[in-house]
């Protein structure tokens, strides 16, 4: 059995017009059912016509068609029925021009191939979609310049809000976000600063917990292997390093860091390098589960027993980690909860609601399985 260690109604407006029936005014004409009146410019029915037919205000009709939860079900049904009768189709461009702001939220992440971020983005989308808000996904590829370009692009037609990854960005991008007035939530990391809203956990504390676990197992030569080298990877490495230093057991040559993208294949390669350099290593913390899974595969090929000869710990508890042989000990990160919480926090900011906790620490779990 795995052992888990936790660280910390709309107002209805109805207009009535009294007009003498057409048959009384034109008794000799054949009367037919009128077709919906179109707009002069486009020939399409308007939102105002939908609202009149449904007997609601224009704003209620707009909200009902967007699926906002602030509109009662009975009004939603009336508005949608009126829209069907009139063959009304929403014009997103006209809506955006009328509001001078699109009903979207921009989400900036450094990768769309890393399952960590796809899990978070999916949770953000699932939380915002019922409120009629779509997301615009920007992929910076871990590059500050690309993220700055994305910030400029999205703010040129301001979204309702932004969710960004961490705090490591160019000063220009930071100034653009601050000056835009667009509500912004940071995720993945924590900061305790005025007017900064963030959802995440302490990466350093997570690295610290891994080091303490390996030391408690009796591992005396503990290595850290990391790839990609984004700020969060470096923070968890720093927490691991400091814990070893406090114990007087830090060895600089037991660190292998590479900017190459994290992968299972890279985990195999870096494990071989480490064993060739220091065959006496008996504990390894790999900064992501794909690296750790690769290390497990390579250890088996090299006839190195895990955990008897070397203990292996990963990070993020990605798919497959519970099915490896041996099953991988790792740090479980609250990715879905993080995306949902960040989206809920942003909704509060968009609605100008009071936010009791601008910094939300979701913590992490050390999941102890068979590999360490």
PLM feature segments, named:
Residues 2-41, 85, 123-131, 155, ...:
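Bacterial carbohydrate/catabolite-sensing allosteric modules
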Residues 32, 73-74, 86-153, 158-161, ...:
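Amphipathic helical "hinge" segments at domain boundaries
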Residues 53, 58-63, 97-113, 213, ...:
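Short beta-strand segments enriched in small/hydrophobic residues
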Residues 75, 116-120, 147, 173-176, ...:
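Residues at alpha-helix caps and immediate loop-helix transition turns in enzyme cores, especially N-
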Residues 141-144, 165-170, 290:
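Short beta->alpha connector loops
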Residues 161-173, 186-195:
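Acidic, Gly/Pro-rich loop/turn segments at junctions of secondary structure
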